[in-house]
Regions:
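Active-site loop/helix belt of alpha/beta enzymes
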Residues: 111, 117-231
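Active-site-proximal beta-alpha core segment in soluble small-molecule metabolic enzymes
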Residues: 22-158
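Active-site loop ensemble at the mouth of alpha/beta enzyme cores that anchors a bound cofactor
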Residues: 167, 200-279
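C-terminal accessory subdomain/extension
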Residues: 252-356
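Conserved, mostly hydrophobic/aromatic
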Residues: 1, 24, 54, 114, ...
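A generic structural signal for well-ordered alpha-helical segments
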Residues: 12-14, 35, 139, 183
Length: 356
């Protein structure tokens, strides 16, 4: 993990881009502090509740990357906002700014980042008139300052061919040109232009306007990302696997299958299946909430065909997770293995379940 943090920080610094890693991946203040120590300009969180955990732990700058749109959420923002740390909020609607105006105390100041969407269709505004209206209102209210803009094209991150991924990412940034022209016409500077991610970390550094990248999964990697091709290979090789889930072999219901005690409650199942690097010839199949089954590929359709799986009952196996972010949210803590290969302690996943 430390090597991944260092590699990303060095890469971004070499291209004169800021390092604003996303804590929705790890949900752990200890890891966030390590990222800040490596030169991060701040930490991203997906939700206000995650931001509360990070600010309470002493993180000095937090950007909430999902839009605020209700007064209840704005009240939560007001509760954590202070002049002792920088709190940046994403807004993409008049409704969201209305909520913040109604709830933020007069003696507090928060930065507003306008979320822009040109291709993904998840969050972000597209209309120029709404963009300008929000910009004007931000400048009129002393509790707010215009911090910049955000553009995240998450649907591009896992495009499997590097050149296709590169083409679509660059095109998505090109479509923001009109927004930058509007800012220039108003004489407004966007100090922050934030976005990008692990899948485009080596592409988006070439974007002139971009100030920092919101990389998240790079810190752990997962099987979904490992299957995405890199610039010069069919596997994503820029960062090492730094997160595994340990499962125990608990049963052998037939000669060609071994059951482990990790299922839907241990791994996020929205993507590919877990992979045991130590047994690459075996395939994992989910077998319910609490279990998974390892099989040889040729035994999947004919379970009686193969023996000699190389696993004994009681063996502890480590699996690369399918999708790191939601898998982390299933667990309470990280067991931390040091360079000597031994586990010397644990780190609480303090923002687990912070989904509001």
């Amino acid at each position: 993990m430390d090597a991944n943090i260092g590699a990303m920080a060095k890469h971004l610094a070499s291209h004169h881009k800021g390092f604003r890693p996303h804590a929705k991946t790890h949900k752990c203040p200890t890891i966030a502090k390590a990222q800040m120590a490596a030169g991060a300009v701040g930490i991203c969180t997906a939700k206000v509740s995650e931001a509360a955990v990070m600010l309470n732990a002493g993180i000095s700058s937090v950007l909430v990357t999902s839009p605020v749109s209700t007064r209840q959420k704005a009240q939560a923002v007001n509760a954590i906002a202070s002049n002792e740390a920088e709190l940046l909020l994403v807004v993409d609607s008049v409704v969201g700014l209305d909520a913040l105006e109604a709830e933020i105390d007069a003696n507090k100041t928060v930065g507003v980042v306008l979320d822009l969407d040109v291709v993904m269709g998840r969050t972000g505004l597209r209309e120029d008139d709404v963009f300008l209206r929000l910009l004007d209102r931000i400048h009129e209210d002393p509790r707010f300052y215009f911090a910049g803009v955000q553009h995240y094209a998450g649907h591009i991150m896992h495009i499997p061919e590097f050149e296709k991924r590169r083409e679509k990412s660059l095109r998505s940034w090109d479509r923001l040109a009109t927004k930058f022209q509007l800012l220039e016409q108003r004489g407004v500077r966007a100090d922050i232009v934030t976005g990008g991610g692990t899948g485009t970390y080596d592409i988006d550094v070439g974007i002139e306007h971009l100030t920092d990248l919101q990389v998240g999964s790079y810190i752990f990697m997962d099987e979904e990302y490992r299957q995405v091709g890199g610039a010069d290979s069919d596997r994503f090789k820029g960062f090492d696997l730094a997160l595994t889930v340990a499962c125990t072999a608990i049963s052998q219901p037939q000669p060609s299958a071994i059951t482990v005690d990790g299922g839907y409650k241990a791994f996020a199942s929205d993507s590919v299946n877990p992979v045991c690097d130590g047994l690459p010839e075996l395939q994992f199949r989910f077998a319910g909430d609490e279990h998974g089954v390892l099989l040889r590929p040729q035994a999947a359709d004919n379970p009686g065909d193969n023996q000699g799986l190389g696993v004994m009952l009681g063996d502890v196996l480590e699996f690369a997770v399918p999708h790191c972010d939601p898998t982390v949210n299933l667990h309470d803590q990280y067991w931390v293995r040091e360079e000597d290969g031994m586990v010397h302690g644990y780190w609480p996943i303090s923002a687990r379940g912070c989904s509001w």
